Amino acid sequence: MSTQATHVVPARSRSALFAEQTYAGVLGKLIGVYLGRAVEGWSYRNIREKFGEIDYYVNDQVNWPLIVPDDDISGTFLFFRALEDNGFPRDLAAKTVGDTWLNYIVEDKTVLWWGGLGRSTEHTAYLRLKAGIDAPRSGSSELNSRAMSEAIGAEIFIDTWAMSNPGDPERAAAMARAAASVSHDGVAVEAAVLLAAMEAYAFVESDIDTLLDYGCRVIHHDELRRIIGDVREQCAKAAHWRDVRRWLGDNHSYAHYPGCCPMVPNHALLLASFILGKDDFQEGLKIAVSSGWDTDCNAGNLGCLNGIRLGVKALEQGPDFRGPVSDLMYVVNADGGECLSDAVIETRRVRRAAAALSGETYEPPAARFAFEYSGAVQGFQLCPLHEGRQGVTAVGNLNTTGPDNGLELRYEALAKGVTGSVSVPTFIDPKPRSLSETSYFEVVASPSVYATQTVRATLEAFEQTSPAVRFFIIHYDGGGELQRISGELLTLRKGKNNLTWRVPDTNGLPIYRLGVELVSEHRATGRIAIIDLDWSGAPEAFVMGGAFDLSPKLTPFDTSSYWIKSFVSSARHFAPDIFSTFCLSHPGANGVITTGSRDWVDYQVSSKLTLDLHKAVGLVARARGHRRYYAGILENQTAKIIKRTDRTVQVLAEMKYPYKENLTLILALSAAGETLRFAIDGHEVLSATDSAYAAGGAGFLIEEGTVPAHGFAVRKIAAATAGG
């Protein structure tokens, strides 16, 4: 059944075309997951009785947010960082991907369904890795049983391996095989390989049958080939998609396979939806979600495949799937400042990997927000906390009607008493996202913007007389309420305007949203565009004081203040301490607690620690996950500067430094260029040089003990000082 024409790559740059297809694949993944997430776990019968067919988002009908943290999204965009973190190896080893799991996953909190050893396949594989069992044995059926190892999870994280190898299905298949074997085995790995090969091939080939034929050639599993052949046969003769769903239920339901979420039923349903949906993006997702089983997984994979194959325009043929999403996504992981992300940022990451693997160069835009893809808004929306009438009537992209990129803001009837504003989330939402005993986990993140950083933006005014603008932040106060701080009004002249704004001090409290407000004394209607917007580098002086400075009404029973939530903790216990600021506590090795992001380059981190029971304690800098960082620590009467890389801890410098129990010391760790300096009570005691980590977050390290920490500060080191 061949109904689609072969895709011919135009004469223009293949890399530009692949970039657009990658963005469409990322968007398709998000749309599919968000569409299917609302009915994940529902039976086919219950979906049919409640909704009939699911053509569009139904999250509001089940009282759940649309944008949620999801294992399908976080795992997909995390695990492929094994490429970036290890120099983009073309010959990817399963062990490398397994080490990446351990670096970014926060146990019992992020990415995975934490259902228990022998119940959740991914949780089981994580525990194997943690125990020192390397991949691929960590995911083997010999160790974990066939029921565990042949579950669906092998393919749900697989899309980025395909998008990192556009037009190279052979290498995509090899990488997918290595990555899938971290947690799975047998038919689950083969199904993941087939899907990755099809997605990589879809960059240059759009015919459904050709893609399926190729996918079947790269797998090593005759039974899976037979099942796929049967699915294709049923789809060819079916009068309606429900006829195929009935056949799948009779022959390949969960009752036919071991485990709680087997691969084969879902893979068969995914391919049936792919075939029956033809070139209709919405139709394919409708079938995948309306058919039950693992709805978000199947729809997410299908959305990515068809996004790549059909392009962004196909996502816009039916209802507005893109508007409610606004490119937003959570990539929940130990690298907390990277959690709040968007489809453009993740597309850049994938493109960087693809370019490196193919020997090409890729220079992404310098600004965080450059809106370079068709219709991209990168999370900017009409500000949901705008007070009074909203004067901005539409948010879009200049590139939908012309050659330029930029966030287009249309405003109407601005005047005294009526302003307009847009904003973008920079930290977790006040509304909970988790649900106990499910894979609905809470957002674990650090803010992406901090007090005393500098916002730089280029705004283009199209009218002869334009409204003034001002930047603003909305931050959490010590009681968890939202407060707004606005900057001064800035005049816009027709044409492009370069603006800067120093983010005001929040006394260490986290910033929830950053926005731009339009203000006019006289009635104004028209449009402006944000061409780019960025903040980068460590904050000038981000300072957190004592616990009561942060939360004046704090009690000993308050354990989840938003300023505590701004840190990502792998330590077993991390909470406010009413006598200092933080309580750092961990019963084993490598209890890491961090905040900040990957654009923090040269800075000093400092805190006052009281040396209670501990094996090791100190400060972390340039953390890129929780198993890749520098630290200045005190351990066994010795001061050390260490570098951790996965399981390896290297001492870069050390000296004897006798100290007594309950002694209070001010520790400071500086990273500037390749130079690391460790100071105690204002005196430098150690220095070292290393080039492994150029930037990253800051925080604490605690091992086998509990230590109170009073205050926390991060101060930028100027370029001249860093180089001097």
Named regions from a protein language model:
Residues 489-498, 510-724:
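Extracellular glycan-recognition regions
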Residues 1-487, 506-544, 603:
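Structured, active/binding-site neighborhoods that engage oxygen-rich ligands
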